[in-house]
């Protein structure tokens, strides 16, 4: 019987081994994770995240899952926005559930500080510890490419969303022009691992992260995977010429 395989950077590994390998990477980079995103995106990830938060437009009383949300970078944005809406017109507190497979990432996030609306749970995107039709929104930012079975994670996201709930994914993607693709490849493979060695003393972890971006499906392929998982009205918004993309779908 052939064992199931999964990608780990440019390597193909036994599917059963990938989660442990990825956990090892994030154990090592957790304390420098937000710096890592600055390096990998040239700091532009902050604008991309702001755009995702604006698209979500979270409201008081909503239940939001921030999957792979470890350091709380997105959740703090959502909490700030829901509090601002409360100040304008009242309403109950939102509940923002950060679920991350890596305890070190959650620890790094808690050290940075949270908010009353935010909870932190160690959990697997492929088997969420949540009931059906639980949340108003599910957001995953720079996390889904690290999941062993992306299709399973998408089905889980669909399962835990209420009817009318929304799925938003921010992920590094495929540049839309050949010139930009070549320039970003050169930056990624020549400079990012070197920055990882200089800033975090871990070239290999950054090398994996660069490779994992290249193995992730392109925008249209990922949109099709979302549709296969049951999402409707799937849309794609490219950022910085497709260096990153936001995918949105609805649980209808």
Swiss-Prot record:
> Keyword annotations for this protein?
Menaquinone biosynthesis, Methyltransferase, S-adenosyl-L-methionine, Transferase, Ubiquinone biosynthesis
Query: So, what pathway does this thing act in?
Result: Quinol/quinone metabolism; menaquinone biosynthesis; menaquinol from 1,4-dihydroxy-2-naphthoate: step 2/2; Cofactor biosynthesis; ubiquinone biosynthesis
Is Cell wall biogenesis/degradation a UniProt keyword of this protein? no
Q: What's this protein's name?
A: Ubiquinone/menaquinone biosynthesis C-methyltransferase UbiE
Q: What does this protein do?
A: Methyltransferase required for the conversion of demethylmenaquinol (DMKH2) to menaquinol (MKH2) and the conversion of 2-polyprenyl-6-methoxy-1,4-benzoquinol (DDMQH2) to 2-polyprenyl-3-methyl-6-methoxy-1,4-benzoquinol (DMQH2).
Q: Which reaction does it catalyse?
A: a 2-demethylmenaquinol + S-adenosyl-L-methionine = a menaquinol + S-adenosyl-L-homocysteine + H(+); a 2-methoxy-6-(all-trans-polyprenyl)benzene-1,4-diol + S-adenosyl-L-methionine = a 5-methoxy-2-methyl-3-(all-trans-polyprenyl)benzene-1,4-diol + S-adenosyl-L-homocysteine + H(+)
Q: Where along the chain is S-adenosyl-L-methionine bound?
A: 71, 100, 124-125, 141
Single GO MF descriptor? 2-methoxy-6-polyprenyl-1,4-benzoquinol methyltransferase activity
* Taxonomic source organism: Caulobacter sp. (strain K31)
């Amino acid at each position: 019987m052939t064992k199931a395989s999964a990608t780990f950077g440019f390597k193909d590994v036994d599917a059963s081994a990938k989660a442990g390998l990825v956990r090892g990477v994030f154990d090592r980079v957790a304390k420098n994770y937000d710096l890592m995103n600055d390096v990998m995106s040239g700091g532009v990830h902050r604008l991309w995240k702001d755009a995702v938060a604006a698209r979500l437009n979270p409201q008081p009383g909503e239940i939001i899952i921030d999957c792979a949300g470890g350091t709380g970078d997105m959740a703090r944005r959502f909490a700030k926005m829901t509090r601002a809406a409360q100040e304008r017109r009242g309403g109950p507190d939102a509940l923002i559930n950060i679920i991350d497979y890596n305890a070190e990432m959650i620890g790094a996030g808690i050290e940075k500080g949270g908010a009353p609306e935010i909870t932190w749970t160690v959990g697997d995107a492929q088997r969420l510890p949540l009931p059906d039709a639980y949340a108003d929104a599910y957001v995953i930012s720079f996390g889904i490419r690290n999941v062993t079975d992306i299709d399973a994670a998408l089905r889980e996201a669909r399962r835990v969303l209420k009817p009318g709930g929304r799925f938003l994914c921010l992920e590094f993607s495929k540049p839309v022009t050949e010139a930009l693709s070549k320039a970003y490849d050169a930056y990624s493979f020549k400079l990012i691992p070197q920055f990882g060695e200089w800033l975090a003393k871990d070239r290999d972890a950054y090398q994996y992260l660069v490779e994992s971006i290249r193995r992730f499906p392109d925008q249209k392929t990922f949109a099709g995977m979302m549709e296969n998982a049951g999402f409707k009205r799937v849309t794609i918004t490219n950022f910085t010429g497709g260096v990153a993309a936001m995918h949105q779908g609805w649980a209808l």
